[in-house]
Amino acid sequence: MFYMKKNLTFSLLAILFCWNVNAQIFTPGHHIKCYFTRPVDTTVARGEKAISLIRTAGDTVISYINRAKYTLDILMYDFVEDSLWFEHGNIPNIALAINNAYARGVKIRWITNTIDTEYSPNTGLDSINPNIPVIHSPTGGSYGIMHNKIMIIDGRSSNPNDPIVWTGSMNWETGQIDKDANNLVIIQDSAFAHGYLIEFNQMWGDTVEGGPSNHANSKFGPFKKDITPHNYTIDGHRVESYFSPVDSVNKHILETMESAKTEVDLGVFEWSETVDANEVGTLQNKGLYMAAIIDQYSTQYTAYGTLSNILGPMMVTYFGVDSLFHNKYMIIDPCNMEAGPAVLTGSHNWTLEADEYNDENTIVIHDSTTANLFYQAFHKEFYSLGGTLTQHCVPLGINEITDNDAVNIYPIPTQNYLSVHLNVLLQNATYHIYNVMGQNVVNGKLDSDNTNTVDVSTLSTGVYVIQVQSANRQFSRKFCKE
C-alpha cells in the first residue's frame, strides 16, 4: 500500500511539475527568443549562442501549439504538409497538433491567403478539423496577399505568463522548414500579444474567441485602420511593431537603417525598393560598414543592380537550386554596444507591394543580444556563400556569460528528443538525467561546439532534471517529457 501511495504521489508531482515546466519556458528577463532554420556561426557570439533548428523547426511549432490552454489565433500565408517530411524521419504533424488542441477545448481561429496553387496552395488546411473557422484573404486589384506568419497563443489569458506571439519569416511549409533560410522570433509578453490580437480581430471582423468571422466588419490590406500600439518595453528593451500596409513600413525600414552609427547587415529575400538601395549607398559614403545577403529572386529588380554596384564584394547572392534565402532582416550596429544594436525582421519583403497592398508584420527589437544572435546567422550564411567580411564582432569573455544563460534546452515539453545547447566552452562535458525520485536514468557526453541531441524517447512521462557538468562547472535544468 505504501509503495502504491508513494508512486501515486510521485505521479501527481510529475503532472504538477510538468505543468510548471511548460509554463516556464520563458524565464524572467528572457521573453524574446530567436531561432534559425540554417546553421549559425557561434564563434562570433558575444555571450548567448544562436540556436539553429535544422529540419526541426516543425517540432518547435508543435511544441508551442501544445502549450495553448485557451486560444490559438493564426495568420499563416501558406500551410503545406507533404511526404517530403518523411525523408528525414522527422514528421512534424502540425495539423494533428492543431486538431488535438481543438479537441482539448482550445478555441482556434485561422486567417490565410486566398489559395494560390503556385505560391500558397495551403493544402495543409485539408487536414484541419472542419469545425475550426478559417477565412481567406480577399481578391481584387486594390489588395495584394495575406503574407503574415503569425501565431498568437493564449492572447486573452489573464495570466501575464501565458500570452505568446510567434512570428518571423517562416511559413508552415516543407521547404521553408527543411531547406530555406528563415528566422523565428517568439515573444512572451501580454501587451505585445494584445496588440497582435487587435490586428487579428480587425481582419477577422469580430472579437469572439473561436467564433465565426464577421465578413461585414472584416478589413484587410489598405482597408484596415492604424489602431495597434507601435511601441512596447520587453525585458527592458524597446520593441517596435508595425503592420502593413497602414503603418508605412518602408518609412520605418529607412528610419531604422538611418539610425545606424557604425554598421548595417542586411538579409533580404525580395528587394525591389530603389529608395532603400540608394540609402545603403548614402550610409556607406558616410563611412558606415555595410554588407548584404540577397536571394536570387531579387536579381530581376533595378534595386539589385544598384546594391551590387554600391556594395561590390560586400554583397553576396543566394543562388539556391531548390531552396531560398527567405529572411527579411536588418541588423543595426551588432558589434557596437554603445550605439544601440537592433534587429528589424518579420514577413515584410522590401517591395512596394508589401508596403502598400499586402498584410504583413514587422518588428524592430532594440537589444544587443538579439542583434548578435542574428549576426551569428548572418556571418555563417555570408561565408557559406563565398563572401568575406572585413569587420567582425569580437566575442565576449566566458566570465561575461551568466549561469542562467550557460545552458539552453528545448523544446519543453519534449516527446522524443531534447536539444542541449552550450553557450560556454566546457571541456569533457557530460550530462546526467535524473527522475523525480533522484534516480540517474540517462547519461552521455556533450560536444561543446554544437547543439547536442539527447534521446529521451524511452523515458516515462514526467518531470526530469538534466545535469550538465565538466571538471569545474555544473548546471542543472528541469524539463518535462510528454
Describe the residue ranges of each PLM region.
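C-terminal outer-membrane/trafficking sorting elements
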Residues: 400-482
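A structural signal for isolated positions on well-ordered beta-strands in alpha/beta enzyme cores
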Residues: 73, 107-111, 265, 291-293, ...
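HKD-type phospholipase D/PLD-like phosphodiesterase module
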Residues: 24-67, 78-256, 293-368
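Long, repeat-rich segments with strong aromatic
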Residues: 254, 259-272, 276-277
